[in-house]
Amino acid sequence: MNKNDSRLRRARQTRLKIAELNVARLAVHRTNLHIYAQVFSEDGTKVLASASTAEAEVRKELNGNGGNTAAATLVGKRIAEKAKAAGIEAVAFDRSGFRYHGRVKALADAAREAGLKF
């Protein structure tokens, strides 16, 4: 089992546990160049809000690339604002098998500071 398979296995386990909670899910995906965040509905069928460093508005505010903690902080603030605008106050945090460290942690902390509860 390689590194990616292990990450996907962890992600599957997390998503099964979150599905039992029946709450909205904040999913994070990380690549070398970008970070993506999506808020899914309680049943997991609809994307209620999304934000990423690939968006034009975010790229204007970034002075470097989208693969750093400053960019993740900006995406965390934007996803919290969009989720609150969609009427979502509390979510379950789905780190998609990534370690809660660095960019993933920066995004989560920024979303919490912007008023999203998880």
Swiss-Prot record:
Task: Show which residues constitute the signal peptide.
Answer: none
The UniProt keywords, alphabetically, are:
Ribonucleoprotein, Ribosomal protein, RNA-binding, rRNA-binding
In terms of InterPro entries, this protein maps to:
Ribosomal_uL18_bac-type (IPR004389), Ribosomal_uL18_bac/euk (IPR005484)
Short name of any one Pfam family annotated for the protein = Ribosomal_L18p
A single Gene Ontology CC annotation of this entry is: cytosolic large ribosomal subunit
> One of this protein's GO BP terms?
translation
> One GO molecular-function annotation for this sequence?
structural constituent of ribosome
UniProt function note: This is one of the proteins that bind and probably mediate the attachment of the 5S RNA into the large ribosomal subunit, where it forms part of the central protuberance.
Q: Which HAMAP family match?
A: Ribosomal_uL18_B
Quaternary context: Part of the 50S ribosomal subunit; part of the 5S rRNA/L5/L18/L25 subcomplex. Contacts the 5S and 23S rRNAs.
* Family statement: Belongs to the universal ribosomal protein uL18 family.
Protein name stated in the entry = Large ribosomal subunit protein uL18
Task: Tell me which species this is from.
Answer: Ralstonia nicotianae (strain ATCC BAA-1114 / GMI1000) (Ralstonia solanacearum)
